[in-house]
Amino acid sequence: MGARASVLTGGKLDRWEKVRLRPGGRKRYMMKHLVWASRELERFACDPGLMESKEGCTKLLQQLEPALKTGSEGLRSLFNTLAVLWCIHSDITVEDTQKALEQLKRHHGEQQSKTESNSGSREGGASQGASASAGISGNYPLVQNAQGQMVHQAISPRTLNAWVKVVEEKAFSPEVIPMFSALSEGALPQDVNTMLNAVGGHQGAMQVLKEVINEEAAEWDRLHPTHAGPIAPGQLREPRGSDIAGTTSTLQEQIGWTTANPPIPVGDVYRRWVILGLNKVVRMYCPVSILDIRQGPKEPFRDYVDRFYKTLRAEQASQEVKNWMTDTLLVQNANPDCKQILKALGPGATLEEMMTACQGVGGPSHKARVLAEAMSMVQNQGRADVFFQKGQGAGPKRKIKCFNCGKEGHLARNCKAPRRKGCWRCGQEGHQMKDCTGRQVNFLGKGWPSRSGRPGNFVQNRTEPTAPPIESYGYQEEEKSQEKKEGESSLYPPTSLKSLFGSDPSSQ
């Protein structure tokens, strides 16, 4: 950390620690901000040693400035930190970050006006060429030397190392495209080819990329046909598709086309072709469709949003279609818990409001809250049911009857009539109704227990099933007579009157 923190020492460090992060804020710049900035520069394949001088900070600011429009919040913070550091090296006193940015912008405007005035003092074509060169003198990798000439600065090994590491780790995932766009900002076709040739693996993907470049080069030749006739001395020829791809053009020709008046940005055109090919390769390496991205039942909404937008970056569609996918599929493919919350927010909710509302959904606290709400609803419903049963029953109200006087509308304990003596059931004295042994009745109003030995709610006389008579053939009649005799004999018990009187002539 000592090497990183040695960017500022002495009085410069004291002035650095007096600068506020925000206008009117309490927090100020500290040593840790310098350490963080050096680490971020290494991550962006830049040399942290340039932070030790004013010229180095100027180079870093020129390299980071083109990516500010599409850069992240971390990139803007890095640019602001370098702007304050540039003011410290330039002995410009500033109070906060906003003042430092204003000083940097003012200085940049003065330098640009000086460059334009110097270029306007030159004569003829040299004046036009110098003014065109001054307009892009800050663009990497073309820099202006002390003699005012545009020279090419080769791509650094740090940039190549960062590019190769991204390809090896990400394997053409959607984030490879913005990384290539950032590393190749302002590069010439020769620099872009150097970056592509540095990729050792994934040769199948590189072949697909080469086919896309050839198709775009053929389309360029069709839309930009060459003019017939000889080329004037000192005039550059018009670039063909193969010249833009860097296969049939030299480095000096590429610099000449880029710095011509009007310029032909062959590097930007070639980068656009490569990005088209990378989009095709990313779609090949990431076959997952945005329609298949669904939130799991226990997946946090933040992770689901990250997966959704990562897949959305790989989708080859217009911005209008992507906006429709975001507005529709992001809510439609969420889990039921988050979907209920998102629908309650309405269609005009922002992503920040969605993530804030769905924060913690699926976790232990959310489950406990849902369980508590469900139990509260059940308890409230139970209280309402009990109140309904006690207060206002669904059926007709039962009339009460007094056992003492026999009138309705009051109970016996509230009866004002004289107390009736004896049992209220049988009318006899000597016992109460609860001890009455009189005849009881069942729910049918009949005596209990039944005298017939069978409860009164059973059928007393059961009819036997009948069948058609059987045809008689003689021997069946004999069997019937025998059965009849057996039946008659079974009616009498073993000890009958016949055995008492012996041979009774009337019984024969």
From Swiss-Prot:
<feature type="compositionally biased region" description="Polar residues">
    <location>
        <begin position="492"/>
        <end position="508"/>
    </location>
</feature>
<keyword id="KW-0449">Lipoprotein</keyword>
<keyword id="KW-0863">Zinc-finger</keyword>
<dbReference type="InterPro" id="IPR000071">
    <property type="entry name" value="Lentvrl_matrix_N"/>
</dbReference>
<comment type="similarity">
    <text>Belongs to the primate lentivirus group gag polyprotein family.</text>
</comment>
<feature type="site" description="Cleavage; by viral protease">
    <location>
        <begin position="140"/>
        <end position="141"/>
    </location>
</feature>
<keyword id="KW-1198">Viral budding</keyword>
<keyword id="KW-1035">Host cytoplasm</keyword>
<dbReference type="InterPro" id="IPR008916">
    <property type="entry name" value="Retrov_capsid_C"/>
</dbReference>
<dbReference type="InterPro" id="IPR050195">
    <property type="entry name" value="Primate_lentivir_Gag_pol-like"/>
</dbReference>
<feature type="zinc finger region" description="CCHC-type 1">
    <location>
        <begin position="400"/>
        <end position="417"/>
    </location>
</feature>
<keyword id="KW-0694">RNA-binding</keyword>
<dbReference type="GO" id="GO:0075523">
    <property type="term" value="P:viral translational frameshifting"/>
</dbReference>
<protein>
    <recommendedName>
        <fullName>Gag polyprotein</fullName>
    </recommendedName>
</protein>
<dbReference type="GO" id="GO:0008270">
    <property type="term" value="F:zinc ion binding"/>
</dbReference>
<keyword id="KW-0543">Viral nucleoprotein</keyword>
<feature type="zinc finger region" description="CCHC-type 2">
    <location>
        <begin position="421"/>
        <end position="438"/>
    </location>
</feature>
<dbReference type="GO" id="GO:0005198">
    <property type="term" value="F:structural molecule activity"/>
</dbReference>
<keyword id="KW-0472">Membrane</keyword>
<feature type="region of interest" description="Disordered">
    <location>
        <begin position="446"/>
        <end position="508"/>
    </location>
</feature>
<dbReference type="Pfam" id="PF19317">
    <property type="entry name" value="Gag_p24_C"/>
</dbReference>
<dbReference type="InterPro" id="IPR010999">
    <property type="entry name" value="Retrovr_matrix"/>
</dbReference>
<feature type="site" description="Cleavage; by viral protease">
    <location>
        <begin position="387"/>
        <end position="388"/>
    </location>
</feature>
<dbReference type="GO" id="GO:0019013">
    <property type="term" value="C:viral nucleocapsid"/>
</dbReference>
<comment type="function">
    <text>Capsid protein p24 forms the conical core of the virus that encapsulates the genomic RNA-nucleocapsid complex.</text>
</comment>
<dbReference type="InterPro" id="IPR045345">
    <property type="entry name" value="Gag_p24_C"/>
</dbReference>
<keyword id="KW-0946">Virion</keyword>
<keyword id="KW-0597">Phosphoprotein</keyword>
<dbReference type="Pfam" id="PF08705">
    <property type="entry name" value="Gag_p6"/>
</dbReference>
<keyword id="KW-1043">Host membrane</keyword>
<feature type="short sequence motif" description="LYPX(n)L motif">
    <location>
        <begin position="491"/>
        <end position="500"/>
    </location>
</feature>
<feature type="region of interest" description="Disordered">
    <location>
        <begin position="104"/>
        <end position="133"/>
    </location>
</feature>
<dbReference type="GO" id="GO:0042025">
    <property type="term" value="C:host cell nucleus"/>
</dbReference>
<dbReference type="GO" id="GO:0016020">
    <property type="term" value="C:membrane"/>
</dbReference>
<feature type="short sequence motif" description="Nuclear localization signal">
    <location>
        <begin position="26"/>
        <end position="32"/>
    </location>
</feature>
<dbReference type="InterPro" id="IPR008919">
    <property type="entry name" value="Retrov_capsid_N"/>
</dbReference>
<dbReference type="GO" id="GO:0003723">
    <property type="term" value="F:RNA binding"/>
</dbReference>
<keyword id="KW-1048">Host nucleus</keyword>
<keyword id="KW-1188">Viral release from host cell</keyword>
<keyword id="KW-0167">Capsid protein</keyword>
<dbReference type="Pfam" id="PF00607">
    <property type="entry name" value="Gag_p24"/>
</dbReference>
<keyword id="KW-0479">Metal-binding</keyword>
